[in-house]
Amino acid sequence: NYGVTHTIRHVLVNDNEKDLLLSCYKFDCRSCGNTKLKRVISLGYQPLANNLLNKKDEKCELYPLEVNYCDRCHNCQLSVAVNPKKMFSNYLYTSSTSKSFREHFVNAANKYIKDFKLNKKKSYIIDIGSNDGVALKPFKNLGFKKILGVEPAKNLAKLANKNKIKTFNGFLEKSNLSKIKKDADLILASNVFAHSDKLKEMAECMFKLLSKNGTLIIEVQYLLNTLKDLSFDNIYHE
C-alpha cells in the first residue's frame, strides 16, 4: 500500500505503477541503512529529468518525487531509486554546454595542481561520472597525460573519447574495477553520489582506485543551501 508511506495519505495506483514502485522504492537509508526515514517533501509524480518526448500525447513512466531524511546520519535522499540503466544508458545533458561549469572546473584544476603538487607527466587523475570530459579537459589543456574519465552513458563516453579525453564506458562498480587502471593521485567525483543508489560500493571502489597518498574530492549538494535558496528545482530523478 503505497499510500501508507506517501505524504498524501492515500494514492491509488494501477498494476503497472504498483510493479514500478515495488521495484524501486527505498525503505532504508542509502548511507547508514536506517529504516526509519522521515518524508520531508513530496513533489508528486514526475518523469525522469531530460525525458524529452516526440509527441504531446506520448506516455512516459512517472515516479514519485519525494525527499526522505535520515535522522541518524542526516542524509537526504529520494524515496525511489530508478534503474540506472534507464537514466544513464543515453544521457542527454552535456556538462560543457554550461559556461559556469567550464569556468568552475578550470579554476578547480588550477587549485588542485597547486594544492596537491600534481605533476604533468607522472600524476594520474580519474574523474567519476565524467560526462563529456568537462572536468578533465583543463588538465589535458595544461599538458597532463595520465587522465581517465569513467562514464556510464555510451553517447557521452563516445563524445569524450572523440575529443581525446580517454574515457571508460561503464558504471563505477566492483565488477568493473579490473577494467580501470588503479593508483590514482587524484579522483574527482562531482555530483556523482546524488546519482547513485549504491553509495557504499561506489565509495569502496574509489578508495581501491586511489593510490596510498592520493586525494579524493567529492562535490555534493548542501542541504542548508538548498533550504536557504529554496532551490527545490534541484530535486529530480536523474
Q: How would you label these PLM feature ranges?
A:
Residues 200-215:
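A short glycine-rich, Lys/Arg-flanked "PGG" loop and its adjoining helix->strand segment in the class I
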Residues 146-151:
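Conserved SAM-binding motif I beta-strand of class I
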Residues 132-144:
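Conserved SAM-binding loop of SAM-dependent methyltransferases across substrates and taxa
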Residues 14-100:
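N-terminal juxtadomain amphipathic helix
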